[in-house]
Regions:
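N-terminal glycine-rich flavin-associated loop
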Residues: 2-29, 52, 59-112, 122, ...
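Short, conserved charged micro-motifs
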Residues: 85-86, 207-212, 256-263, 315-321, ...
Length: 414
């Protein structure tokens, strides 16, 4: 896609005109802000493959900037193309944070850390390791302003969580991957940031035992905010001194109360062996590595086919044996076992056949998989929610027909 194929509206009227014009010309638009997640969704890959002659980039970078931030009211409103780094900076200055811990996946696609936007995070419903305790990005969206595929401006939600005005469109658009409407402005709920954090970890646990430990810790009274399992091949990248697996549990909170909770948790874990402790700075560095999937953004792993598998935690340990069958492949678990990151060497032969095995494995475990980094021809097949049944697919088609009947933003179902 050349620069001449890009459309960059700077206000609402220009955006509406661009969409209406595309409908009239039977053209298609690929929405992006900083282009930091190019190839993330099935919709983009299908557009790139099939419609290159009539495809234009809809550059939303003109809709940026924080126009409302009231720390005392715990709300922030910003343009969809506002960089997450700018938002994080303002929140940190006021000891606040987005509770769902938005990850930074730009380096996974060769980009610079901090290059993502608020619109990209919300469009993809990207949630970090704290999701298991604080909820997803979707749960923190208060309001959205957007233009549909019909060229119609609409606003939904407001400045409070309670919604009595009708359909909760902000939650619907969150995770829609830019296939229903072009978001221009987003209002978010923010919360006070934790004063400090610490991580307790156990070494050399087998995957099935690790999942049990994580499940028990997350359901305990110690307020564990994140839980992950790192096989030895992954653990050594962030802690070079180790040659064992790591099962990591994070606690956050007030400086006065956190040490007591940490000690209680460590006593609770004694039956599984001696635990070790990472203090605040080391703990934050470790969880950035985990939440941003940095293992797959550096070295030989940068070219891996990359999957996110959403699995029932009770079944997620089965991925260990499955990965051994694949050959050169790597994984780790986040969300207490609910999310598995799986990277498969780009040198693997019969890539499509391997991807079919991965998708089938996820279904067998009662979950589903999404291919988030691969050649377009593979993402176009495996980058969507293939586990949906006929009823769910029909419902999604009805929603898409209401917002974007001409398929301006996506000719295929995500």
């Amino acid at each position: 896609m050349s620069a001449s194929d890009s459309i960059r509206p700077v206000d609402m009227e220009e955006l509406r005109a661009a969409i209406v014009s595309s409908v009239e010309r039977d053209a298609h638009l690929r929405i992006h802000g900083m282009n930091s997640k190019r190839g993330w969704s099935r919709a983009w890959c299908a557009l790139a493959q099939c419609l290159s002659k009539n495809l234009h980039a809809l550059d939303m970078s003109g809709f940026d900037g924080i126009d409302l931030y009231e720390p005392e009211e715990l709300i922030l409103r910003a343009g969809a193309a506002t960089r997450m780094s700018e938002i994080q900076k303002h929140l940190q200055e006021n000891q606040q944070a987005l509770s769902f811990e938005p990850p930074d996946f730009a380096p996974l696609y060769g980009g610079t850390a901090g290059g993502g936007t608020l619109g990209g995070v919300i469009a993809c419903n990207l949630s970090g390791s704290r999701r298991v305790r604080a909820g997803a990005a979707r749960d923190c969206v208060l309001g959205i302003e957007a233009v549909s595929g019909r060229g119609e401006l609409f606003r939904s939600g407001g400045r409070v969580m309670k919604n009595v005005t009708g359909y909760d469109l902000p939650k619907l658009l969150t995770g829609s991957h830019g296939t229903l409407a072009a978001m221009t402005q987003i209002t978010m709920k923010v919360l006070p940031a934790s004063e400090t954090s610490a991580s307790v970890f156990l070494s050399n646990l087998k995957p099935d035992i690790a999942v049990v430990v994580m499940t028990q810790a997350l359901s305990s009274a110690y307020e564990v905010s994140a839980a992950a399992y790192l096989p030895a091949s992954v653990a050594t990248q962030v802690m070079p001194a180790t040659t064992n697996t790591l099962t990591v549990l994070r606690l956050e909170g007030a400086e006065k109360s956190l040490p007591a909770r940490v000690e209680l948790l460590r006593k609770h874990l004694m039956e599984h062996g001696d635990s070790e402790l990472l203090q605040d700075d080391e703990s934050r560095a470790l969880w950035s590595f985990i939440g941003d999937a940095r293992f797959f953004a550096s070295g030989d792993r940068r070219e891996d086919l990359l999957w996110r598998l959403f699995l029932p935690p009770s079944q997620s340990h089965n991925i260990d044996a499955f990965v051994r069958q694949l050959g050169e492949a790597y994984y780790f678990l986040d969300w207490g076992g609910g999310l598995a990151w799986l990277g498969i060497s780009n040198e693997t032969k019969e890539k499509r056949a391997v991807c079919e095995k991965v998708a089938a494995f996820a279904l067998e475990q009662g979950g589903y998989g999404v291919l988030v980094r691969a050649p377009d021809e593979l993402c176009g097949v495996f980058g969507g929610f293939s586990a949906l049944g006929a009823l769910e697919n029909a419902l999604m088609e009805r929603v898409r027909a209401a917002f974007d009947p001409d398929g301006v933003f996506s000719p295929v179902q995500v």
